[in-house]
């Protein structure tokens, strides 16, 4: 009896092994399949290249802004570094939401579930706003004690406090800007998102440095550059996104 059970078990194991081997053979890598697929490459480049170019050009405006900050002295430079570390906590929380919105929007768009496309975008916008306002508000409220953990200089703490009062409270605008950009990429409009960010953020900041900051050369006017650029970019994104979303919905209806 025991021998029969062992024999039956061995046969079942052999059958399962053969089945798994068939699956492996079906998924095996063949030399003739190792080639460039033009359509897939074009789709990846259409989405990836604008994002990469945007990041590169964005760095140029950041260098110019950092140069302007450095012009206010060592204490301001130190304060900016400290405040940036705390603001990065808010940014990373919002960035996670905005990045995931691309996945949800693109997958539901590909699955032709347009209601979920809209729900994904609206949920991401709502979550980002709440996270940005709550975390940003807390950081602005606790700016002085938080910065005191890092430095004993009252001057540096004061400069950091000034920055966080202006930027931390309005950081949710940066999150909204990111969500709109990533949702547009999810709809296949990566180039559109790139041009909006480059114009509303990068170009605007360069113009601000050469006009507003030169007329009012104060730390406050320099830091106001950030919320002003986020607000402008978000306001540009709003009509563009909803027009693109509406067109995407009509396209899905026509193809059904």
Regions of interest found by a model, annotated:
Residues 11-49, 105-170, 212-256:
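Short alpha-helical transmembrane segments in multi-pass integral membrane proteins
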Residues 51, 55, 63, 67, ...:
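Transmembrane alpha-helix boundary and packing residues in multipass membrane permease domains
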């Amino acid at each position: 009896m025991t021998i029969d059970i062992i024999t039956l078990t061995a046969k079942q194991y052999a059958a399962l092994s053969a089945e798994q081997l068939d699956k492996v053979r079906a998924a095996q890598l063949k030399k003739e399949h190792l080639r460039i697929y033009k359509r897939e490459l074009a789709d990846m480049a259409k989405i990836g290249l604008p994002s990469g170019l945007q990041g590169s050009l964005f760095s140029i405006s950041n260098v110019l802004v950092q140069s302007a900050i450095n012009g206010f002295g060592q204490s301001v430079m130190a304060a900016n570094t400290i405040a940036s570390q705390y603001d990065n906590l808010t940014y990373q929380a919002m960035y996670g939401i905005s990045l995931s919105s691309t996945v949800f929007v693109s997958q539901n768009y590909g699955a032709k579930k347009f209601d979920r496309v809209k729900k994904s975008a609206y949920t991401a916008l709502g979550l980002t706003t709440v996270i940005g306002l709550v975390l940003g508000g807390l950081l602005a409220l606790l700016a002085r004690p938080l910065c005191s953990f890092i430095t004993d200089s009252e001057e540096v703490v004061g400069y950091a406090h000034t920055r966080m009062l202006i930027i931390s409270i309005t950081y949710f605008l940066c999150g909204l800007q990111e969500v709109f950009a990533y949702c547009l990429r999810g709809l296949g409009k990566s180039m559109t998102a790139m041009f909006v960010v480059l114009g509303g953020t990068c170009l605007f900041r360069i113009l601000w440095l050469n006009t507003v900051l030169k007329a009012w050369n104060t730390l406050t006017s320099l830091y106001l550059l950030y919320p002003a650029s986020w607000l402008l970019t978000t306001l540009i994104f709003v009509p563009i996104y909803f027009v693109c979303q509406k067109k995407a919905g009509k396209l899905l209806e026509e193809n059904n």
